[in-house]
Swiss-Prot record:
Name of the protein described by the UniProt record: Elongation factor Ts
InterPro entries for this protein: EF-Ts_dimer_sf, Transl_elong_EFTs/EF1B, Transl_elong_EFTs/EF1B_dimer, Transl_elong_Ts_CS, UBA-like_sf
Stated family: Belongs to the EF-Ts family.
Species: Campylobacter jejuni subsp. jejuni serotype O:2 (strain ATCC 700819 / NCTC 11168)
Keyword tags: Cytoplasm, Elongation factor, Protein biosynthesis
Stored Gene3D superfamilies: 1.10.286.20, DNA helicase RuvA subunit, C-terminal domain (1.10.8.10), Elongation factor Ts, dimerisation domain (3.30.479.20)
Amino acid sequence: MTEITAAMVKELRESTGAGMMDCKNALSETNGDFDKAVQLLREKGLGKAAKKADRLAAEGLVSVKVSDDFTSATVSEINSETDFVAKNDQFIALTKDTTAHIQSNSLQSVEELHSSTINGVKFEEYLKSQIATIGENLVVRRFATLKAGANGVVNGYIHTNGRVGVVIAAACDSAEVASKSRDLLRQICMHIAAMRPSYLSYEDLDMTFVENEYKALVAELEKENEERRRLKDPNKPEHKIPQFASRKQLSDAILKEAEEKIKEELKAQGKPEKIWDNIIPGKMNSFIADNSQLDSKLTLMGQFYVMDDKKTVEQVIAEKEKEFGGKIKIVEFICFEVGEGLEKKTEDFAAEVAAQL
């Protein structure tokens, strides 16, 4: 019988990441054969992983990988059962390695990922070994990659706690403008992480959805106005009820009508026509802002920029286009939040203990 030394246990533990007693028992069962002990731990670990597979994994981390040339950006979400494990160094390394693997192999689906090879083994087996070592069910829930086209650029941002990740892609009219836009895209990703827009622009909104939201907006404002009339607080005047909710509704005819109305008002005020061109753009912008509240709530381009709330994201991009000397068009963005849409399982401690008996 081979003597099992502390050094042997330490070596096996460092190699497999398994617990100290598990390593000692594995070495004892295999008469000190290191390779057989590794295999035995894998076999036992895989058994544990299978048991854990039915546990709900709703915690975890989002990871972002941007290629060095800013032509590819990948975001992934890997779930664990507890927030504690999500802070584990080994789990953090797993998320980063998996995201890099997805990007470098241009993987398109979770099924494709599981059948791919990482570090010489099938990813599915690799993940099971990580489950056995870490001790919780781990699930690669989703991932996506954005690629830059000709004269395009991508970037990404991961919030410091790893719970929110964003990737974004833009098309530019030159490689020079694309290169200059890298930092801007990262800042817009930070905005997205904070403000969570649901759409890129008003053009992506469905008209029926807009019309229904307009009715809800009017009802909400009228209810608030009723309360303000009751309180009679001079510091809280009644809301102005908008005619529309989105630029999606502002046809050329409606904009033309609004402009003509502004001209009539200026004429009635006795403003000389020679200064109208200086006044009309600002009043038209106010008209559009008043009648696009849905856009500022739900769309990236219509939201006020978190780093300068006097301007919309669209206006910030327009300023950068002038500064960089070319066009910048946001093509797509993707935002992942850990556990988004998953129902977290809650149990009291007594129930948890009882479930294990």
